[in-house]
């Protein structure tokens, strides 16, 4: 039985809950752009049966190059996410990279996200668990789905059972990822809601030399397959102009693509239930 739990004040994720949508730009570029993207997505999903959580990173600590844009940092980034909450009434999620970030982040964020590259870091997982907030752990590209039992065990050791797991592809040779759709069933059998990160799954890590490439045209295909497989949520990086995005533009969706794919996912989910 998949665990079902609450997010924020009036939202559930898991068995029987509406489709969870985690969406937003890869990184906080500035306050104006962040609020614009959040408001656009909110408008798109207004009449859809989805639970929308806005996502943007205050720091992209694992960019390919030292010259890559990382974001505004913890303090300024959390302030901007706080404005998304207060002005638009949206729950928010962002990455935490070290135990010392968990305290201030948990004062603003509705969900703490553990990056894929850090999914085995015990101190980070237990700190996130001790916050009492829901924890979204992204499965590392190098981790088997069954190994997430040990990852979730670290969070569970704190008494926090509000855990979700996100599939974002597995390393397939150099500079490429592939999605094993068995992973959704395997991780759901661990007892936790499963989310599919469809945009990072088409990423080509380091594929452009000093930054990552990707191909957003495959996102709808993979997302539809994941909906048929019974995922509890989907994760999309979305931008008003992906080709000018400061991070992960090649794999980010346009607003028009998001508006097109969501009704398809809801129809597939209904048919498969």
From Swiss-Prot:
<keyword id="KW-0448">Lipopolysaccharide biosynthesis</keyword>
<comment type="pathway">
    <text>Bacterial outer membrane biogenesis; lipopolysaccharide biosynthesis.</text>
</comment>
<dbReference type="Pfam" id="PF00793">
    <property type="entry name" value="DAHP_synth_1"/>
</dbReference>
<keyword id="KW-0963">Cytoplasm</keyword>
<keyword id="KW-0808">Transferase</keyword>
<comment type="similarity">
    <text>Belongs to the KdsA family.</text>
</comment>
<dbReference type="GO" id="GO:0019294">
    <property type="term" value="P:keto-3-deoxy-D-manno-octulosonic acid biosynthetic process"/>
</dbReference>
<dbReference type="InterPro" id="IPR006269">
    <property type="entry name" value="KDO8P_synthase"/>
</dbReference>
<dbReference type="GO" id="GO:0005737">
    <property type="term" value="C:cytoplasm"/>
</dbReference>
<protein>
    <recommendedName>
        <fullName>2-dehydro-3-deoxyphosphooctonate aldolase</fullName>
        <ecNumber>2.5.1.55</ecNumber>
    </recommendedName>
</protein>
<dbReference type="GO" id="GO:0008676">
    <property type="term" value="F:3-deoxy-8-phosphooctulonate synthase activity"/>
</dbReference>
<dbReference type="InterPro" id="IPR013785">
    <property type="entry name" value="Aldolase_TIM"/>
</dbReference>
<dbReference type="InterPro" id="IPR006218">
    <property type="entry name" value="DAHP1/KDSA"/>
</dbReference>
<comment type="pathway">
    <text>Carbohydrate biosynthesis; 3-deoxy-D-manno-octulosonate biosynthesis; 3-deoxy-D-manno-octulosonate from D-ribulose 5-phosphate: step 2/3.</text>
</comment>
